[in-house]
Amino acid sequence: MSKSRTPSRVRNTEPVTFETVRRLALALPGVEEGKSWGTPAFRVGKKFLARLREDGDLVVRVEFAAREVLMGAAPETFHITDHYRDYPAMLVRLSKVDPDDLRDLLEEAWRRNASKKLLAEFEEGRDR
């Protein structure tokens, strides 16, 4: 989700589950599923993108400025705890997030961490 885009105001009716997260994350080139802190996580190369927390929230890598915008626009969906205050990450309540917003968040996290080769492959695939 770009800094200028705020979360969707009209919620998509598709319920977001971890299977939704998995499908969206693994659709991005080079993303692999593994474990982080004992829960499912996604990385591109060795770089963290997202992980499921024990409480069911999703931790997503996000720039600080974008995090502030999103938390201000939809605090019921996007939040942090003190633990994440100094990290470029944000918590996402899967029960509240719109699937399109989640897809955008995961794609932006991926774009910031993917290799130039993977980025080129992704863009080439979009042009087809």
What are these regions (language model features)?
Residues 1-128:
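Charge-dense, helix-prone N-terminal extensions
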